[in-house]
Amino acid sequence: MKLLRGIFKAVISLALLLVMLTAGVYIFVRAKYGIDLWNTVGQLKAISKSVDESEVCPDAFVAGDYTSMQTVVNASVDGLVGGDEEAGFTISFDTLPSEMTSIISLTDKQVGALADVVIKKYVNSKITIAGKDIAIVLKQIKFDTDENGVTAFNTVVRLDMTPFKQEMNKFPLKYLKKYVPQYMYVSSTVNVTKGTTAFSYHIEHNALAINKLSADKTEDLFKTLDKVLKIGDAETLNKKIGNIVIGSLVGSESQTGLAYSLKPIGATDYAFTKVGGVNNFVINK
């Protein structure tokens, strides 16, 4: 009987010690880093669950959208988009025909296919976050233009988080590392407003969501991670994704994009249009 009581007391003491140590770690991390460990672990657990792509990007562009995009673009600019579904698609603005023969009008899925081809060629499918080059894969693009001409532009991308996980070996990140998935699906929505001059635009933050987290919880998680990883807030990443994708479509002197690159052969501007409930990205001549 005395032996059982001794074992019971030892177990209780050990349990209390573990509780005190855990509470101590929580209080220390909260005080030193401003991180709520329990809340952060809960959020990371939510995004660490396996992701069904059909749920996070139900309207993803597919192989046929590359082919139809190629047909539309090449009907105006002969030979601009090369390749096929088997070999993959390519694009180059180095050698252009003498003239853009007609306007180019693309649906959201065709826009997704075009942006993917341009980003692979001219951005090397990378996005820089906290000084690290992160592999980015476009999965879905949808946009809608309101009566005021503001376009809510949504992009779903997959980010490879390996470079960050490799550096999460020190306290307190080592406690969070196992909950960070290798891939994060990021839904980026920005508001795009056309500028007053040709080929110009302005991008504003709308919403950012990771995997199945809400936009609010995503912003809260980014605030936490920024304190130790210095990755910036959700708005910063959102605008970065938006600028890469919109830049691949419109372009400028500093970023290679379709519309601006066709200026020497007759392109006059771009537009996001909505006619009969159908949204299109248009390059005018």
Set out the residue ranges of the language-model regions.
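Extracellular/lumenal and peripheral-membrane lipid-interaction modules
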Residues: 2-285
